[in-house]
UniProtKB/Swiss-Prot annotation, chain A:
Ranges that cross the membrane: none
Example of a GO biological process term: proton motive force-driven ATP synthesis
Protein name from the UniProt record: ATP synthase F(0) complex subunit B1, mitochondrial
Key words of the record: CF(0), Hydrogen ion transport, Ion transport, Membrane, Mitochondrion, Mitochondrion inner membrane, Transit peptide, Transport
PANTHER family: ATP SYNTHASE F(0) COMPLEX SUBUNIT B1, MITOCHONDRIAL, MITOCHONDRIAL ATP SYNTHASE B CHAIN
Subunit-structure text: Subunit of the F-type ATPase which has 2 components, CF(1) - the catalytic core - and CF(0) - the membrane proton channel.
The organelle targeting sequence, given as a residue range: 1-21
Signal peptide range in chain numbering: none
Matches recorded under InterPro entries: ATP_synth_Bsub_B/MI25, ATP_synth_F0_suB
């Protein structure tokens, strides 16, 4: 609030220092709540001063009183070279940008710019004397006539001061937040409008890159596929011939094996027949028994 | 063996790297080619590359009775020549046809991109020329957000601060077109 500039921070700081000193003095006392009086506790609570047994300052509803609000982030300024129209004269008619803070005033209502023109010539008191004299002249000549209810303006001024001292900080913070939200809404509309253009640029760039890659890779892949088909067919033929030659060699080997197996079978058959023929004779049985008995006798010894 | 001048055992295309750069439509095209190529690639990897070497001398020792047959087999085997062949020219022409088609497609895409860029530049220039939103004056809101604001100085419409749709129907305009008060359109004035 512009009126907060008229208050003197030094006075408040001095009072605050005195209060802090009082707290410090009490902290040296023995650490018990009984050392601080009942009404002094209430005063500490109102001022937001921690008690000796507390580590943090208590939350007070008066924290925002007599506090001057300032924007955490200033509004973006208009670019220096911004022109609404090519013919605009930026030197004599700059773009009327919105100021962040109201201009400085004196005595709650007079613009500071009215005073600075006089101040170079007459000093600090000159403007006050001029406007005061002018006011007195107007009142004296009944050019400025007071209404019977005019004295209530003083009350309104006091009420305004009361509200701005107490709730001004929160009002300013809330208004700033609402303004940011409102501007954010419009910025969202702008981004929504630009989103289509941005998306189009991205999509078209991706498609262009895709076309380039396809143009580069697709003919090669097609020809490679056909070459691979040739190679596959060739290898198929190779396999066919390999199978045929292996089959014939296996046939020849099988022929030899069959012949050898047949010879062996015939030989075994001949041997078996001879043995059976010999066994069936009676002389062989007697000769065999004699041999068996002789062998048994030898074993008995 | 084969007298082929050039043999391809594997594809020279890096499919994964190529697929990363493609948009889904083109990736679908490449996937079809990759499928066919993959079929042949698997066949190529499974089948033998060349005719095996056969030791006929050892066979002759093992099978002396068939040495004559083995001799003739050896002659036949050594004289075998498997033709490799070439890709038919008409198929290569088809590849060229596809290249022409793709070039035409690319040209069409470039034309579309140029038109789209013009539209995009219009929008971007519009907002580049606009002052910051924080410093909009009253007429700027009407100019840049016509859907949300109106200016009765030059727009023929009825103020509708509560947004109840007074401008959506012509009834009010027709009702008050005649300056006479509370006169219905169907009232007969025959006094």
């Amino acid at each position: 609030m512009s009126l907060s500039r008229l208050s003197s921070p030094q006075t408040f700081s001095r009072v605050f220092i005195v209060a802090r000193g009082a707290a410090t003095g009490h902290a040296v006392a023995p650490s018990s709540d009984n050392s601080i009086g009942y009404f002094e506790k209430i005063a500490y609570r109102f001022k937001g001063i921690p008690l000796p047994t507390e580590t943090e300052a208590p939350k007070s509803m008066f924290d925002a009183c007599n506090k001057e609000w300032s924007a955490p982030e200033l509004l973006p300024s208009v670019p220096k070279d911004f022109k609404e129209h090519p013919d605009r004269d930026l030197t004599n008619y700059p773009y009327p940008s919105r100021p962040m803070y109201p201009p400085k005033t004196r005595l709650l209502m007079m613009p500071d710019s009215w005073f600075t023109a006089f101040q170079k010539v007459t000093g600090t008191s000159g403007p006050y004397l001029f406007f005061g004299g002018l006011f007195a002249f107007l009142v004296n000549k009944e050019l400025w006539v007071f209404e019977e209810q005019g004295h209530m303006t003083v009350g309104w001024i006091l009420f305004y001061l009361l509200v701005s001292r107490t709730a001004g900080y929160k009002i300013d913070a809330g208004l700033y937040k609402d303004y940011q939200e409102r501007v954010g809404f419009f910025k969202g509309l702008i981004q929504e409008d630009l989103k289509e253009a941005v998306d189009f640029r991205k999509t078209s760039a991706a498609q262009t890159a895709s076309f380039a890659a396809l143009k580069e890779g697709m003919p090669t892949s097609l020809k490679d596929s056909m070459q691979l088909q040739l190679e596959a067919a060739y290898r198929k033929n190779v396999q066919t011939i390999s199978n045929e030659i292996k089959r014939r060699i296996e046939y020849l080997k099988e022929t030899e094996e069959t012949k050898a197996r047949f010879e062996r079978d015939q030989l075994l058959k001949l041997i078996n027949d001879s043995v059976e023929k010999q066994v069936s004779q009676k002389d062989f049985q007697e000769k065999f028994l004699q041999n068996a008995i002789q062998q048994l006798k030898g074993i008995a010894v | 063996m084969s007298g082929a001048a050039k043999r391809v055992a594997t594809s020279s295309v890096n499919w994964s790297k190529l697929a990363e750069r493609l948009v889904p439509e083109h990736a679908a095209e490449l996937t079809r080619v990759k499928g066919v190529s993959g079929t042949f690639q698997s066949a190529v990897s499974q089948l033998p590359a060349d005719l095996p070497k056969i030791d006929f001398a050892a066979l002759k020792k093992a099978l002396p009775a068939h040495s004559a047959v083995l001799d003739s087999l050896q002659k036949q085997y050594e004289s075998v020549k498997i033709p490799y062949g070439e890709v038919p020219a008409e198929y290569l022409k088809e590849v060229d046809q596809w290249v022409d088609y793709n070039n035409a497609r690319i040209k069409l895409h470039e034309v579309k991109v140029a038109d789209g860029l013009q539209e995009a530049k219009k929008v971007e220039e519009k907002w580049a020329k606009a002052p910051p939103v924080e410093h909009f004056d009253r007429q700027h809101f009407v100019e840049y957000f016509p859907a949300h604001f109106y200016d009765l100085r030059y727009q023929n419409r009825i103020p509708d601060p509560c947004n109840i749709g007074l401008n959506e129907t012509p009834e009010i305009e027709n009702r008050f077109k005649d300056y006479k008060v509370l006169r219905r359109a169907d009232k007969v004035d025959d006094h």
